């Protein structure tokens, strides 16, 4: 689960992390009071959306002006002007796609006198099963681009959970960033604070880009992105309260209500599969035959008829879906339950695109019989390869 920048900074402030002062606003009329509270003489007006690249982004509406989603204001009048232009407008960035995202919140922040910019993040390293830090002298840019063009400028290390963060971890960061003396000590302290926040709040990602050195010789977090581990949210009702569903895909929200593992993608073939491994294999073979999946959807091993029906409705609600592939290998999951759910959903919402169903495993004959006797226009498949070829052919016509 992601949260907004201003929420992330408020959370980090609780752990002593040095962040700039700021005030979130939901209405343009609140901008003046926010700016006066901060005092100036320079303010930064930041769009709050769950996507990166805001500064280089562009608004769709001409009324929002030709500047990006992060703007420097040198007067309170400019703060008010930018707030009026940006709130309610649609910001398009490299991460939003062409549709963009509507800006419903702004963060008015005090300006910083920046000397240097760095990159620093903490994340879960799946290879070592530890929290890892990633550090780079290239701040304020996309870290993936740095990894591609200048990998030697990235330093990473993991933290042993038995010891937790230690002073040498902070010194590693300081050395990687060329920070000495008091700034080196600040880096040591910051790494410990970030690690403590990461562990205490069960984060999946904590990204600071950029981390800056001000001309006053202070380390400061200028931008922060926090993502929580969804599986640990039950332990953090305070984090759940920060959720902004308007920033999330409506289909993913609906899927979460039925405990379905669903991720929206950009393709045209909807997929309903049981098991993450089989789901990924299904997506791969669709790509192999020349098309792209519209989603990742794992119904799990113990799905009920209602859960399967909900999954099917979520897929059909996507206007980009031009065909659907149901691929089930029944172990704990029974093929007849899948069949009943699919039939029930189709009868409720209709079927306007080709549907290919491949069933194998527990109660497969009963499942195939339910599909066959339903009267629905369903293309049966004998195996995964056959299913993929049939749905691609049906969609391409």
Swiss-Prot record:
Pathway: Carbohydrate metabolism; tricarboxylic acid cycle; succinate from succinyl-CoA (ligase route): step 1/1. Mg(2+) binds at residues 209, 223. Keywords: ATP-binding, Ligase, Magnesium, Metal-binding, Nucleotide-binding, Tricarboxylic acid cycle. ATP binds at residues 46, 53-55, 109, 112, 117. The keyword Ligase applies. Its EC number is 6.2.1.5. Disulfide bonds: none annotated. GO terms for biological process: succinyl-CoA metabolic process; tricarboxylic acid cycle. Binds 1 Mg(2+) ion per subunit. InterPro entries: ATP-grasp, ATP-grasp_succ-CoA_synth-type, ATP_grasp_subdomain_1, SUCC_ACL_C, Succ_CoA_ligase-like_bsu, Succinyl-CoA_synth-like. One of its GO terms (molecular function) is magnesium ion binding. Residues 9-254 form the ATP-grasp domain. HAMAP family: Succ_CoA_beta. Succinyl-CoA synthetase functions in the citric acid cycle (TCA), coupling the hydrolysis of succinyl-CoA to the synthesis of either ATP or GTP and thus represents the only step of substrate-level phosphorylation in the TCA. The beta subunit provides nucleotide specificity of the enzyme and binds the substrate succinate, while the binding sites for coenzyme A and phosphate are found in the alpha subunit. Heterotetramer of two alpha and two beta subunits. This is Succinate--CoA ligase [ADP-forming] subunit beta. It comes from Nitrobacter hamburgensis (strain DSM 10229 / NCIMB 13809 / X14). The lineage of its organism: Bacteria, Pseudomonadati, Pseudomonadota, Alphaproteobacteria, Hyphomicrobiales. The gene is sucC.
């Amino acid at each position: 689960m992601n949260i907004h920048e201003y929420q992330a900074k408020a959370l980090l402030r609780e752990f002593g992390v040095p962040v700039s002062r700021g005030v979130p606003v939901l209405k343009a009329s609140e901008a003046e009071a926010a700016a006066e509270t901060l005092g100036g003489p320079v303010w930064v007006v930041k769009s709050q959306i769950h996507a990166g690249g805001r500064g280089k982004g562009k608004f769709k509406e001409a009324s929002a002006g030709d500047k990006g989603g992060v703007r420097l204001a040198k007067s309170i009048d400019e703060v008010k002007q930018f707030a009026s232009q940006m709130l309610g407008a649609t910001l398009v960035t490299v991460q939003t796609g062409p549709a963009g995202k509507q800006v419903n919140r702004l963060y008015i922040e005090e300006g910083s006198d920046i000397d240097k910019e760095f990159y620093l993040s903490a994340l879960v390293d799946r290879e070592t099963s530890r929290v890892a830090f990633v550090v780079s002298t290239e701040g304020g840019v996309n870290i993936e681009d740095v990894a591609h063009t200048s990998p030697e400028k990235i330093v990473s290390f993991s933290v042993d959970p038995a010891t937790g963060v230690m002073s040498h971890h902070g010194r590693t960061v300081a050395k990687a960033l060329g920070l000495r003396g008091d700034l080196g000590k600040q880096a040591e302290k910051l790494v410990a604070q970030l690690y403590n926040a990461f562990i205490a709040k069960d984060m999946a990602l904590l990204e600071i880009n950029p981390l800056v050195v001000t001309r006053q010789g202070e380390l400061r977090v200028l931008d922060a992105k926090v993502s929580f581990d969804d599986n640990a949210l039950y332990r953090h009702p305070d984090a759940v309260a920060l959720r902004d569903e308007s920033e999330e895909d409506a289909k993913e929200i609906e899927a979460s209500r039925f405990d379905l593992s669903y991720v929206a993608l950009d393709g045209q073939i909807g997929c309903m599969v049981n098991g993450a491994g089989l789901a990924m294999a299904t997506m791969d073979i669709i790509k192999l035959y020349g098309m792209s999946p519209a989603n990742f959807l794992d119904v799990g091993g113990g799905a009920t008829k209602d859960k399967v029906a909900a999954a099917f409705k979520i897929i059909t609600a996507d206007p980009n879906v031009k065909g659907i592939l149901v691929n089930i290998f029944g172990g704990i999951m029974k093929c007849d339950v899948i069949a009943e759910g699919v039939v029930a959903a189709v009868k409720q919402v209709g079927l306007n695109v080709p549907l290919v169903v491949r069933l194998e495993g527990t109660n497969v004959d009963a499942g195939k019989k339910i599909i066959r006797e339903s009267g629905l226009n369903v293309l049966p498949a004998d195996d995964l390869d056959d299913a993929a070829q049939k749905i691609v052919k049906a969609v391409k016509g």
